[in-house]
Amino acid sequence: MSIQQPTTIRGARTRTSRTPTKPHGQWAVDGREPLNTNEEIKLADDGLNVRERIETIYAQGGFASIDPSDLHGRFRWWGLYTQRKPGIDGGRTAQLEPHELEDEYFMMRVRIDGGQLTTQQLRVIGEISTEFGRDITDITDRQNVQLHWVRIEDVPEIWRRLEAVGLNTTEACGDVPRTFLASAVAGIAEDELIDPTPQLREIVDRYLGDPSFSNLPRKYKTAITGHPSQDVVHEINDCSFVAVEHPDLGVGYDLWVGGALAAVPRLGERLGTFVPPERVAEVWHGVTSIFRDYGYRRLRNKARMKFLLADWGTAKMRDVLESEYLASPLPDGPAPAEPVGAPDHVGVHRQKDGRFYIGAATTVGRLSGTTLTRLADLAEANGSQRVRPTVFQKILVLDVPEDRVPHVVAGLDELGLPSRPSLFRRGTIACTGIEFCKLAIVETKANAAQAIDQLEQRLAELEPEIGQTITLHVNGCPNSCARIQTADIGLKGQLVMIDGQQVPGYQVHLGGGLATEGRAEAGLGRTVRGLKVPADGIADYAERVIRRYLADRSEGESFATWAHRADDEALQ
């Protein structure tokens, strides 16, 4: 609160006038009175409670029977969003009300904590997609699988089938702890510092669906890895644990908080603590409780952990964590070592038990349910019963005997899942886009897939010269679900002026990236004034800027480094 100089008024007592400030909606400071419609809906009824109404009322009564506060609010707590109505162009996204944009079908997000799937579970997801979702699935960049074209009448049966094999959609969306990211090679990699699976399982078992965390200010994202490649995009999660080796205390985790992208990107920061493995769940509970109790709730666009961290700083965050929420302070700890290895795990790799895992590239995450079923069959026919999606829209087949590796590689190729993809197929991810998302302005997956095909044709002979995966991330709106600010080439969907005409296109971000081998620290991409790309021009722009990079780079210079030093003209 700012304090002004005393103001003198004739005939009145002199007093200090204060600039009035509105409460931020912090429960621990301002109390729990709801300060906006979303908070009112959450206070009126916990989002977890809507499941019973879905099963007993809405599935019987159909879409028209759904209460709007459930449809546009609480359904998310069970992984359900209404889809975008087909045929509404991106220019109308901001003009129409949400109910005018929505179809009477749902996207359903299947929660896959740590990406840990059995082939039986994968087959069930594929069968559900084929039977109830028009044979369309998307692997997301948060290790989830999303189904489309789901009718409310079918939701209880889908839940029954998922839960019969140990899957669920609990808190897959909403103002809750979202799917927990974990290294896709947890427990199998020869070079991991520690297997984070026990810590992941403890958090999930204790806190998934816990009403004490079912009303957070907004979404809350967690990541944990024990792998030296730092393969869980920890810098852009609300709470992350990255394996480190303490000189006196052994292997544990470095704690990061406050990362997120969207329209106001902010990279997470270290609190400087060492978290022993046995205290990870306690520390996660403490950080999450801080967000619940002190997070800003009045304005939705300020309600992420990153805004609280920006105001508090890391010293206060650590002090509040240790003094108010932990049983005892944490020791100081070292920063993670520079990353080693490719975090997407594409290719054939030996496991610590002598078997192999094989990482394959999807095409921007889009797969049919039939393909998922065939993938489960392929894995099982070759001795594997485990698969794992990654945070890069890739998928791993685990536990393959050495003599079966060639058979799996060939089978993956037949499924359109190459384990030796081009640099462009390997490096490209895309969000859902205008096909299904009510927030989107531009098509993403089809445009990105077309660009991959074109770049493979035009630049195939240059791949040895390029010598690195140049990441291309395509997003349909400013919210950055596809992490555009942390890509070599990030494309943000918007309407752009091309030759005097307003058309769907993209704003370009260049030179972003998270910590990886050859890049010690994360950094956000730059934008170039006036640089816009039409929706059908992704490959044209990418080819142009890659060829300029090859012509202008210094020896050993990465694309990201070059993009930050190049002048605007070179980046057009």
Spans of features found by a protein language model:
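Peripheral terminal and linker regions in Fe-S/redox and tRNA-modifying enzymes
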Residues: S2-Q572
